[in-house]
């Protein structure tokens, strides 16, 4: 079984489950993958608790151990910022935990030349903790929007998705996407699991979607999870 530690936020966890089901859609119920979603919505807010490291870590460990206890073979976390705690979390849990940033890096390495400009849209916490820079800085030029766009476009869009206002979120993210396209990024990582919900919900960004510039870490993680699941 696949263990999914959700609740960071709830919409992102459900989005992951939906993608997991669509990837391996079967004609019978028995052909779908078995998974456990723990929507642990009481995990302390990641961006606000970077300095209270162990508050978040302890809650993540508790969630992972529950999935481990329920016979899951491996765990995924549909939250980019949560991977700031990944290294310590992995030490405290006996079953494997897939790394979303690492999988995104490996996929990008297959599709982009070395030193390519790669855009990232994410929370300020994901940017400040450098969970993607850890992998990308060696071989790519990772760029993000300026402070004004981060505040008024990216942060706003993420907040709107969490509130369930998807149409407003899609409108809010447009300026940040336009900026990264203007500076000719080869790929744009949707480095917050709320952002694909905003971007792919409507017909906007049609040309960009067709060019496959967007990287959806949730979708990528779902694909990797299915491959791993089938090996058990």
Report residues per predicted region.
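Non-catalytic structural scaffold of enzyme domains
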Residues: 1-232
């Amino acid at each position: 079984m696949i263990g999914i530690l959700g609740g960071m936020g709830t919409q992102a966890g459900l989005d992951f489950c939906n993608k997991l089901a669509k990837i391996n859609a079967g004609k019978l119920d028995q052909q779908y993958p078995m998974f456990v979603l723990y929507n642990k919505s009481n995990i302390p807010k990641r961006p606000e608790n970077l300095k209270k490291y162990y508050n978040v870590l302890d809650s993540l460990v508790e969630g992972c151990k529950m999935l481990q206890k329920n016979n899951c073979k491996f765990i995924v976390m549909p939250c980019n910022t949560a991977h700031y705690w990944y290294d310590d979390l992995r030490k405290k849990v006996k079953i494997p935990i897939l790394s979303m940033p690492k999988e995104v890096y490996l996929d990008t390495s297959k599709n982009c030349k070395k030193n390519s400009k790669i855009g990232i849209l994410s929370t300020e916490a994901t940017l400040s903790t450098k969970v993607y820079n850890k992998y990308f800085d060696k071989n790519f030029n990772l760029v993000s929007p300026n402070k004004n766009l981060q505040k008024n476009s990216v942060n706003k869009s993420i907040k709107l998705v969490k509130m369930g206002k998807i149409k407003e979120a899609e409108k809010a993210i447009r300026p940040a996407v336009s900026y990264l396209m203007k500076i000719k990024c080869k790929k744009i990582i949707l480095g917050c699991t709320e952002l694909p919900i905003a971007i792919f919900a409507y017909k906007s960004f049609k040309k960009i979607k067709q060019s496959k510039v967007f990287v959806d870490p949730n979708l990528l993680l779902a694909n990797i999870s299915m491959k791993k699941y089938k090996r058990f």
